[in-house]
Amino acid sequence: MSITITYRIETPGSIEAMADKIASDQSTGTFVPVPGETEELKSRVAARVLGIRQLEDAKRPTWPEVAEGHGPLRRADVDIAFPLDAIGTDLSALMTIAIGGVFSIKGMTGIRIVDMKLPNAFRGAHPGPQFGVAGSKRLTGVEGRPIIGTIVKPALGLRPVETAELVGELINSGVDFIKDDEKLMSPAYSPLKERVAAIMPRILDHEQKTGKKVMYAFGISHADPDEMMRNHDLVLEAGGNCAVVNINSIGFGGMSFLRKRSGLVLHAHRNGWDVLTRDPGAGMDFKVYQQFWRLLGVDQFQINGIRVKYWEPDESFIESFKAVSTPLFDPSDCPLPVAGSGQWGGQAPETYQRTGRTTDLLYLCGGGIVSHPSGPAAGVRAVQQAWEAAVADIPLANYAKDHPELAASIAKFSDGKGA
């Protein structure tokens, strides 16, 4: 039984030699033969090259300093199998072996991890999502359409009372989900304890009056797992049901510690992820990265969206959406995809079409809701109307003729600058 990692290698030298070196260095080998590296030992734990698929040569090196004075830059996808006996199901061991010293090997001008296939031994080895798609929809009371969410803006600087005033306006707008910006955790001007105490009475009062409980995701991340757990408990004990976790900041250990004790929906923000992926010739594909966090138990996963304000192209978002929506072992291990970043109703039709005509997502709009010319309530209605049009295959411009909120949204945001 093996774990198969696919590396996209770029080198002016031999692809085969690089593949063999990765397999050796990341399992039993070192720079010279050593006593004890027997054939029996290697048969149990040595990695093996399974296959090499040649790709078009690179036009320019990912790491230019490595390629000086060399010839063609050969590229190939290389599948390497690592025996489960060498790794087990520990995710820190898997990350160490999959990445480890690979990026420091001499002779390559680039390397990227583009796929990972886990054996059935990982099924049940980690908790996975506690709520996921079904739980998120149940707790928000949303069926047959996306969960519509927004973000407290300004992202930083509001005091708890000021935040609660804004939240009061947002929950009356008809929105399903509100979150702290990922940068907001527990600063001196807005301690989490005070923010929870100011916001949750508004949420609960609205629920009592209307029967609808808006899901609010509080930022609870902390480098100290015990402190993060105390933050979690503050939210849970006040009647909250969701938390923002900055997964790269808290790490595998922090996420594992939290998930095993959590009673909250865990909304994963991947800030810092771009360090690992923005260079197309190095780093790691999201298809690989997301598997770790899903096994650890994130319930909702932010993955950007269509025509975002950041660098990521639409094709990358579509691939990410497909990745988180594809079961690792069972449909219950899929988190809810979260489309965000510069979103408003204008991206709804393309999002719907390109993600397989699904409404199983959280559609997160900041300025696209709160900056609507007629206020947040009109902003929410405009996004809902856009999704109604998308699902019915009606062009937005046509639907807007009878829906003034959508019409005003198109007028403000269609140039791509407003949201």
From Swiss-Prot:
Mg(2+) binds at residues 179, 181-182. SUPFAM superfamilies: RuBisCo, C-terminal domain, RuBisCO, large subunit, small (N-terminal) domain. The modification N6-carboxylysine is found at residue 179. It catalyses: 3-oxoisoapionate 4-phosphate + H(+) = L-erythrulose 1-phosphate + CO2. Coiled coil: none annotated. The keyword Magnesium applies. Its cofactor is Mg(2+). GO terms for biological process: carbon fixation. Pfam families: RuBisCO_large, RuBisCO_large_N. The keyword DNA damage does not apply. InterPro entries: OiaX, RuBisCO, RuBisCo_large_chain_AS, RuBisCO_lsu_C, RuBisCO_lsu_C_sf, RuBisCO_lsu_fd_N, RuBisCO_lsu_N_sf. Keywords: Carbohydrate metabolism, Decarboxylase, Lyase, Magnesium, Metal-binding. PROSITE patterns: RUBISCO_LARGE. Transmembrane segments: none annotated. GO terms for molecular function: magnesium ion binding; ribulose-bisphosphate carboxylase activity. Its EC number is 4.1.1.121. It comes from the Bacteria. Pathway: Carbohydrate metabolism. Belongs to the RuBisCO large chain family. PANTHER family: RIBULOSE BISPHOSPHATE CARBOXYLASE, RIBULOSE BISPHOSPHATE CARBOXYLASE LARGE CHAIN. Involved in catabolism of D-apiose. Catalyzes the decarboxylation of 3-oxo-isoapionate 4-phosphate to L-erythrulose 1-phosphate. This is 3-oxo-isoapionate-4-phosphate decarboxylase. The gene is oiaX.
